[in-house]
């Protein structure tokens, strides 16, 4: 059993980024219109810097950063495997490299597959950075995924064969995307739901806002599981999130003699999405757990205002 509390996390003063963080060999960030993302990219000291331009943001060629100074990767399609493979192919050798990833602007499915791919490629550790906004632009009306298809699917390679005789359990991280929440719940209709709410939230009003948005998702909020089985994890702490998932899975396997099909659906902050990825890499893969997400066709380029604070997470992939 892994104790995720031993993983190291610390706040970073955003006016002293270069002083508080070491020099890196490789820095990766997903380009969008957020000043949080652009400020960090400019402030980080790294031998090589890579912009990953997600197709879901639909940037024109004129809007994409110049490739004269830093590497710019423009994947050919939206699949997680294509985006990550094109990124890693451009980066090249990862051995003995000090790697930093700004997870703030990443699409969830790509972030999860990237963490799994780093593990597969022998990377033992990396630093992840997450920047908190002061507030979301439209409060409880903020839209993140602007267009999704009708497809819900597992992350590439992050799935297990289900047993029709076992009980389905869906551990779902609750965020602002009520449409995605509704899609996931409908896809696993009949499963036992285990909602994980982001609390403490990034700010005092965000928990209430996400709860109000989740209420729009339909029948899942009328299910008794919504109240009786809810859990909480801090919105800005991936390791605490991984611990909540780990403890819950162990509890379910103990109660049902391991006869469970377990599905994870990270729909909240990128810090918590990282926590889902860390759990899967260190425990969920061997347990046979599937991570599900609705297919996102377009995503809002900027949903927030201001930079509240930065967090640095030392992610260990070999424990």
Give the location of each predicted region.
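Long, low-complexity, Lys/Arg-enriched
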Residues: 1-98, 106-319
């Amino acid at each position: 059993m892994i104790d995720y509390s031993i993983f190291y996390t610390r706040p970073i003063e955003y006016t002293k980024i270069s002083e508080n963080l070491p020099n890196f060999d490789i820095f990766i960030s997903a380009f969008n219109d957020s000043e949080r993302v652009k400020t960090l990219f400019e402030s980080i000291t790294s031998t090589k810097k890579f912009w990953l331009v997600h197709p879901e943001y639909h940037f024109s060629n004129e809007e994409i950063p110049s490739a004269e100074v830093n590497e710019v990767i423009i994947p050919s399609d939206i699949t997680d495997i294509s985006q990550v493979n094109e990124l890693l192919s451009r980066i090249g050798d990862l051995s003995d490299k000090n790697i930093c990833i700004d997870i703030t602007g990443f699409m969830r499915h790509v972030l999860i597959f990237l963490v799994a791919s780093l593990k597969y490629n022998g990377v033992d550790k990396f630093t992840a950075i997450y920047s908190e906004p002061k507030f979301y632009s439209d409060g409880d009306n903020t839209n993140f995924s602007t267009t999704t298809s009708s497809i819900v699917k597992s992350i590439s390679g992050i799935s297990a064969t289900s047993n029709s005789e076992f009980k389905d359990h869906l551990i779902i991280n609750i965020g602002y995307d009520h449409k995605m929440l509704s899609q996931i719940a409908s896809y696993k209709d009949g499963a036992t739901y285990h909602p994980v709410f982001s609390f403490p939230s990034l700010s005092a009003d965000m928990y209430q806002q996400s709860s109000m948005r989740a209420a729009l998702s339909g029948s899942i909020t009328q299910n008794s599981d919504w109240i009786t089985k809810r859990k909480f994890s801090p919105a800005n702490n991936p390791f605490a999130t991984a611990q909540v998932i780990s403890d819950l899975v162990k509890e379910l396997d103990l109660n049902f003699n391991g006869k469970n099909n377990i599905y994870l659906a990270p729909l909240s902050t990128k810090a918590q999405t990282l926590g889902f990825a860390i759990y899967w890499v260190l425990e969920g893969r061997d347990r046979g757990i599937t991570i599900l997400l609705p297919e996102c066709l377009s995503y809002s380029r900027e949903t927030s205002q201001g930079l509240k604070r930065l967090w640095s997470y030392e992610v260990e992939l070999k424990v």
